[in-house]
Each structure stands twice: as C-alpha cells, then as structure tokens.
Design a protein with these regions (language model features):
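Catalytic cores of alpha/beta
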Residues: 11-19, 69-73, 97, 115-125, ...
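Active-site beta->alpha loop and helix N-cap motifs at the rims of alpha/beta catalytic domains
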Residues: 3-5, 9-13, 19-21, 27-100, ...
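Glycine-rich phosphate-binding active-site loops on the catalytic face of alpha/beta enzymes
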Residues: 29-33, 112, 128-140, 183-202
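Conserved, mostly hydrophobic/aromatic
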Residues: 28, 86, 122, 178, ...
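Alpha-helix-loop-beta-strand connector modules within alpha/beta enzyme cores
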Residues: 44-58, 95-108, 144-164, 207-217
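Glycine-enriched alpha-helix->loop->beta-strand junction motifs that scaffold or abut catalytic
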Residues: 20-24, 80-84, 100-109, 124-131, ...
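Histidine/lysine/aspartate-rich catalytic loop segments that bind and position anionic ligands
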Residues: 112-147, 154
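C-terminal alpha-helical cap/extension of soluble enzyme domains
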Residues: 155-217
C-alpha cells in the first residue's frame, strides 16, 4: 500500500517525508486556501515546492468544470513537473478530459468519486488513480469502506490498471481497513499517519525499558 499525505502544508509534508514512508501528496483548492496560497503564480510555485520535498506523485487539482478549461489547466499543471498528477472531478466533462489526458500520456486522479459506477467510468477513461471519498460517505451514514470493496472487485474482474486511492480518510482505522480490503493507496492527514505509531502498550513498555536501563548504570 502507498501512503500519500493530504495537505498543502510544506512542514507537514516534510515531516511525513522524514518518516521514510511517504509515497506522494494530494492537494485541493480548499487545502491551498487553508495555507493562504492564493493567486495562480503562487499556487503553481507551491506545487513545484511540494515536488522538491517528495519523490512521488503530487495530485494538483483543476478549477475548471468545462472540457476546454480542464484541458487547458491540466496541461499547464502537468508541464510544471514530472511528478504532477492532474486531479479531475468526476463529471461528464471530467471523464472526457481524463480520456484526452490518457491519450496524451498525462496522468490523472479522478476525484469526488462516491459510487462504483463512477469508478468504473474513470477506469474506462484511463485514470491513473480514482479517489473514492470514504469519510464523506460515512458522514452520510453510508459505508465508505464497502465502496472500496466494490471498486476492488470490479477492477480485479477486468484487470483495470487504475489505482484505488482511498480519500477523505479520517483516522487510523480507516487506513487499516483500507489495507485489509486492498486499496492501492490511502491519502490521509499527518495525524492519521502518525497515529499508526501509537499504542499504549508500546508507551508503557518503553517506559519500563528506560527505567530498567537506568538501574544498569
């Protein structure tokens, strides 16, 4: 399983990178705004800065929702750096654009996926990644993890190469359940990733070891 961090915060990206387990980054306009990154030039420069920290894929999202606009923005993003993956919304023109990008050799991440049917269309169009939002489905009393299972079954049935990138991951149990189901990638906040480090028995065991070590002189 690949680990992506879902943030535009450079210090958090660096911290995750320093752990040695980071495979990539996902961003979106909301995360950019949260970091106070505004204006086209600043946003593009920020994407480039992220690419200098990590060695893996960096998903950069288009703002446009029409085919021509998505293509224009996507081509500009893809030209920034070889690590950039163009993040495209699951809409009609988005699917058309994903097929266009696929034919041009530009990698894509189909975002805002909430059904297996949407994931199937994204794979047919040649998306590199598909991003089902499990946390948002859970918020609606739906089962986000079941969606991952459905997509995994469909993709395995037809040997689709599109990778399942579980998004809207809220906590460590989401990560673990996605790993059991067979998601190819999870993207999560730093707190969820570092949360995997923690267990009360680890803390108490370490405290005991350190106490015993002091007795040794």
């Amino acid at each position: 399983m690949k680990f992506f961090i879902d943030t535009a915060n450079l210090s958090q990206i660096q911290e995750a990178q320093d752990l040695g387990v980071l495979d990539g980054v996902t961003t979106n306009p909301s995360l950019m705004a949260k970091e106070g990154i505004t204006g086209k030039e600043a946003i593009l420069k920020h994407y480039t800065n992220i690419c200098t920290i990590v060695e893996g894929d960096v998903s950069a999202e288009v703002i446009a929702t029409d085919f021509e606009g998505i293509v224009r923005e996507g081509e500009e993003l893809a030209a920034l750096h070889p690590q950039i993956v163009v993040k495209v919304p699951m809409i009609k023109d988005g699917i058309k654009a994903i097929k266009y990008f696929t034919d041009k050799g530009i990698r894509t991440n189909c975002t805002l996926v909430f059904s297996a049917g949407q994931a199937l269309l994204a794979a047919k169009a040649g998306a590199t990644y598909v991003s089902p939002f499990i946390g948002r489905l859970d918020d609606m009393s739906a089962d986000g993890l079941s969606l991952i299972e459905e997509i995994r079954l469909i993709y395995d049935n037809y040997n689709f190469e599109t990778q399942i990138l579980a998004a809207s991951v809220r906590h460590t149990m989401h990560i673990l359940e996605c790993a059991k189901i067979g998601a190819d990638v999870i993207t999560a906040p730093l707190s969820a990733i570092t949360g995997l480090l923690k267990h009360p028995l680890t803390d108490s065991g370490l405290a005991q070891f350190l106490a015993d070590a002091k007795k040794l002189g």
